[in-house]
């Protein structure tokens, strides 16, 4: 394959697609790829940008993918670099770093649904990065599409002029050519100095079984070639370049160099993505750039949960599996922990609940593990009486009550857009979740935008499911962490047969403790199988028992073998059984079924 002449910077366009879940982003990406003939019709599959099975099944994008497209317009050859971004709230860090490598973004809105909360959040990230925003109304072929109302909706909500918005249908392939031409004429070419020292931004990284850890980079200044030695500015380590490629969902395209303004994949032969952290800067080892690229924050976990293998001898397999997933996911972090009830496992940090579900599902599906997940928690700031501060993410680490001066919990600012008919139900839900209303505005007659501050631990349990059920699935939701605020929190323990089951402990608002404790013991009573001895299930705060249920013992007919009517013989056997039950009650261990741990997540 002969080496192509480098594309001049004025003919490069780097753009990304911002859209809410289900607004047709991946389908639109497929259309653009097909229109530019980047993939032959034979190899084209739907959602070609979503490479994980779990992405295709759930219809969501998790890892941001990129593709290089060639397009000829008015006799000139252009290179269009499309960076696909996830749309779900948990993956907004993927969005922010993808947007840093672009000059423009397509704001895709479903013609039947209008602007959603997540879209607004990501559009603001794009505007903060000074991106040119092109509004695109998708699904115009649907009978209930209302293009004029949606344009007005975008103008009112985000403040972007939509008089010339592109109207497309990715499914029916309408308006795709016009959209490509609009990208070329409207989105600015990349800026940067081709003669300056190399400065490249890593905006994604993943692990390849053959090439090791790969970095997806945007060249901001200078250029990179295969003979170069590279310095990773964050780690201070130097590496030789083993290979350079242009991104394509099916097969990477090798190249000798990546020029200023281009997007490409760099292989440095590294064993883990931790050596090429996302947001880090690559530069030339001999002639480094004076300052790395600014404005990047490492992804911080928001939710923590314990993951334990059901087969206790598979602890090492779980460690291996987590390490492999971490190669691809710099937001995932974990440390070993042990629980009296569940044995050895890991405390794992996630970006949010969807991230936690996806990781758990991948561990079970790709590595064949059976796992128990404990109730998710957030990080609490505990001020102790000796003026020190302790950060607690596991309820079992909470110090005794008499050592605590106060506890602060993290709050988030939640933005919710809902049809106005569900407003009453929604406000009731938010009040139950200890929400504080900050703002309420009507976007039009039928849609309302609410802004609330909420404690993080109220949204990590089941808030998303409840939000969807009380608005029949129509509300959309986005949040950003704001600050820690003082709260009245206590640790609620569950005791089974007198022993605290550490994996079931939760930190909860004091006013909700009795209600939750009552619900917990009642649910546990249903789930724990009857034993040969009586089992007490108690909920306690500190040393105070606040709720109790008893599982009656299974009666075994010990007198069945006694024929004839000797009552003393029967009495002797019954006394012996009573003694045995007493002893079992003292030393007996109760096996807790996995459903008991899952039940905690589902209890209001």
UniProtKB/Swiss-Prot annotation:
InterPro entries: EF-4, EFG_III/V, EFG_V-like, EFTu-like_2, G_TR_CS, LepA_C_sf, LepA_CTD, LepA_IV. It is found in: Cell inner membrane. Residues 10-191 form the tr-type G domain. Disulfide bonds: none annotated. GTP binds at residues 22-27, 138-141. One of its GO terms (molecular function) is GTPase activity. It is a peripheral membrane protein. HAMAP family: LepA. PANTHER family: TRANSLATION FACTOR GUF1 HOMOLOG, CHLOROPLASTIC (PTHR43512:SF4), TRANSLATION FACTOR GUF1-RELATED (PTHR43512). This is Elongation factor 4. It comes from Helicobacter pylori (strain P12). The gene is lepA.
């Amino acid at each position: 394959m002969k080496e192509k002449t480098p594309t001049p910077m004025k003919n490069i366009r780097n753009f990304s697609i911002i859209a809410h879940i289900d607004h047709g982003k991946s389908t639109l990406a497929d259309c653009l790829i097909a229109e530019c003939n980047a993939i032959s019709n034979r190899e084209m599959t739907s959602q070609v940008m979503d490479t994980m099975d779990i992405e295709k099944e759930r219809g969501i994008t998790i890892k941001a993918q990129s593709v290089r497209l060639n397009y000829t317009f008015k006799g000139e050859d252009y290179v269009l670099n499309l960076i696909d971004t996830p749309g779900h709230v948990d993956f907004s860090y993927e969005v922010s770093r993808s947007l840093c490598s672009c000059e423009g973004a397509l704001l895709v809105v479903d013609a039947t649904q209008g602007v959603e909360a997540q879209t607004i959040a990501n559009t603001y990230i794009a505007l903060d990065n000074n991106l040119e925003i092109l509004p695109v109304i998708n699904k115009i072929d649907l009978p209930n599409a209302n293009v004029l109302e949606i344009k007005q909706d975008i103008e009112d909500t985000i403040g972007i002029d939509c008089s010339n918005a592109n109207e497309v249908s990715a499914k029916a392939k309408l308006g795709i050519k016009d959209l490509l031409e609009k990208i070329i004429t409207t989105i600015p070419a990349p800026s940067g100095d081709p003669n300056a020292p190399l400065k490249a931004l890593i905006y994604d990284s993943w692990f390849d079984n053959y090439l090791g850890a790969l970095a997806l980079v945007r060249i901001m200044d200078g250029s990179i070639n295969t003979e170069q030695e590279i310095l990773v500015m964050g780690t201070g380590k130097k590496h030789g370049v083993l290979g350079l490629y242009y991104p394509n969902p099916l097969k990477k395209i090798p190249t000798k160099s990546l020029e200023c303004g281009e997007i490409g994949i760099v292989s440095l032969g590294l064993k883990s993505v931790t050596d090429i952290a996302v947001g880090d800067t690559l530069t030339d080892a001999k002639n480094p750039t004076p300052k790395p690229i600014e404005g990047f924050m490492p992804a911080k976990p928001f939710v923590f949960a314990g993951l334990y293998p059901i087969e206790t001898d598979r602890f090492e397999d779980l460690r291996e599996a987590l390490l492999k997933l971490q190669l691809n996911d710099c937001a995932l972090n974990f440390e070993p922990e042990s629980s009296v009830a569940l044995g050895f496992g890991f405390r794992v940090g996630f970006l949010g609940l969807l991230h936690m579900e996806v990781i758990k599902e991948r561990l079970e599906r790709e590595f064949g593990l059976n796992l128990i997940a404990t109730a998710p928690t957030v990080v609490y700031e505990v001020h102790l009486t000796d003026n020190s501060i302790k950060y607690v993410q596991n309820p079992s680490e909470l110090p005794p009550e008499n050592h605590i001066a106060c506890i602060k919990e993290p709050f988030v600012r939640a933005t919710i857009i809902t049809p106005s008919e569900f407003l009453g139900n929604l406000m009731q839900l938010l009040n139950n979740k200890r929400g504080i209303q900050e703002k309420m505005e009507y976007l039009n007659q039928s849609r309302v935008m609410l802004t609330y501050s909420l404690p993080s631990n109220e949204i990590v349990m089941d808030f998303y499911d409840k939000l969807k059920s009380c608005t029949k699935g129509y509300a959309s939701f986005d949040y950003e962490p704001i600050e820690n605020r003082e709260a009245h929190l206590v640790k609620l323990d569950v005791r089974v047969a007198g022993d605290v089951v550490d994996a079931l402990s939760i930190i909860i608002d004091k006013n909700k403790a009795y209600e939750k404790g009552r619900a917990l013991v009642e649910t546990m009573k249903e789930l724990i199988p009857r034993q040969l001895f009586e089992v007490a299930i108690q909920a306690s705060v500190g040393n105070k028992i606040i709720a109790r249920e008893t599982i009656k013992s299974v009666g075994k007919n010990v007198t069945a073998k006694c024929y004839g009517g000797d009552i003393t013989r029967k009495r002797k056997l019954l006394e012996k059984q009573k003694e045995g039950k007493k002893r079992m009650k003292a030393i007996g261990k109760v096996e807790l079924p996995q459903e008991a741990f899952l039940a905690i997540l589902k209890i209001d």
